[in-house]
């Protein structure tokens, strides 16, 4: 039997039985009283059976009469007010048990949905594995870059140290290249020294333009020397006031502060 209040037979008032059944009027009957009602005649057959089993003895007849009286008196009691109240109480108890049973069966429904016995390998095998796309090299060219705190522009002079003799060799930057991994490189144009070139420093006036390299070099092997010289390396703009042949716009260099920039007319007048 489920946990809770124990049922009581409406006929014999017993609380223990191997089987409980419900009568036609809603009363609860034990297994013994259910067998009596099914024998026929409101319990007349159990009395007759008791008399027959007793034979000629008076004891058997007395037991049968007592049994008949108890069974015949039981139905009117069940039809009365007290029996009706108890039957309603039992119906209420039964409905409460049914609600508890439904409440307890809810986790069982969740177990059906749960993936029992399926581990992480099953989750990862739901879809077929797909190879990652191959990386495509993307090159971005630029006219200026910022590398290790130094602002490089096209035309700047850099030095490269040779691994064999350890001497510096100078070159001019022709362009900048950046790949998909943000690795920066520069295309160089070598500067050839002359007999008048000093050994300890770089003098732009004593160098001539040499061959151009086809492959760019990484910026980590280059060391900044100076920005683009004004006249010798054919810079389109100059930091110094010169006599221009035609009006020029878009200078890289500018004045810092309230001092106005030198105009072309003032420059020409000073030189004259």
UniProtKB/Swiss-Prot annotation:
Zinc fingers typed GATA-type, residue spans = 9-33
The residues joined by the cross-link Glycyl lysine isopeptide (Lys-Gly) (interchain with G-Cter in SUMO2) are: 265
Q: Which InterPro entries match?
A: GATAD1, Znf_GATA, Znf_NHR/GATA
| GO BP annotations listed | chromatin organization; regulation of DNA-templated transcription
Q: Does the keyword Nucleus apply?
A: yes
Q: Which GO terms describe its cellular component?
A: nucleus
Where does it live in the cell? Nucleus
Q: Where is this region: Disordered?
A: 67-120
Arranged from A to Z, the UniProt key words for this protein are: Acetylation, Isopeptide bond, Metal-binding, Nucleus, Ubl conjugation, Zinc, Zinc-finger
Q: Which domain of life is it from?
A: Eukaryota
Q: Residue positions of the PTM N6-acetyllysine?
A: 167
One GO MF term attached to the UniProt entry: sequence-specific DNA binding
Q: What is this protein called?
A: GATA zinc finger domain-containing protein 1
Q: Which gene encodes it?
A: GATAD1
């Amino acid at each position: 039997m489920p946990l809770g209040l124990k049922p009581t037979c409406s006929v014999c008032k017993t609380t223990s039985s191997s089987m409980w059944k419900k009568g036609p009027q809603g009363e609860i009957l034990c297994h013994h009283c259910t067998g009596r009602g099914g024998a026929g005649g409101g319990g007349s057959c159990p009395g007759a059976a008791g008399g027959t089993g007793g034979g000629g003895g008076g004891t058997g007849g007395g037991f049968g009469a007592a049994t008949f009286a108890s069974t015949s008196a039981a139905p009117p009691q069940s039809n009365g007010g007290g029996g009706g109240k108890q039957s309603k109480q039992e119906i209420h108890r039964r409905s409460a048990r049914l609600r508890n049973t439904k409440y307890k069966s809810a986790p069982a429904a969740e177990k059906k949905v749960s993936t029992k016995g399926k581990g992480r390998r099953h989750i990862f095998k739901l879809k077929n594995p797909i190879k990652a796309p191959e990386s495509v090299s993307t090159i971005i060219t630029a006219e200026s870059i910022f590398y290790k705190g130094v602002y490089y522009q096209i035309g700047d002079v850099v030095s490269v140290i040779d691994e064999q003799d350890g001497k510096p060799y100078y070159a001019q930057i022709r362009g900048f290249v950046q790949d998909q991994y943000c690795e920066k490189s520069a295309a160089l144009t070598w500067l050839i020294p002359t007999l008048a070139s000093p050994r300890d420093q770089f003098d732009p006036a004593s160098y001539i333009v040499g061959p151009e390299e086809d492959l760019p070099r990484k910026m980590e092997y280059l060391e900044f020397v100076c920005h683009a010289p004004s006249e010798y390396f054919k810079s389109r703009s100059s930091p110094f006031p010169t006599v221009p042949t035609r009006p020029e716009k878009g200078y890289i260099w500018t004045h810092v502060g309230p001092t106005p920039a030198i105009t072309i007319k003032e420059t020409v007048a000073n030189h004259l």
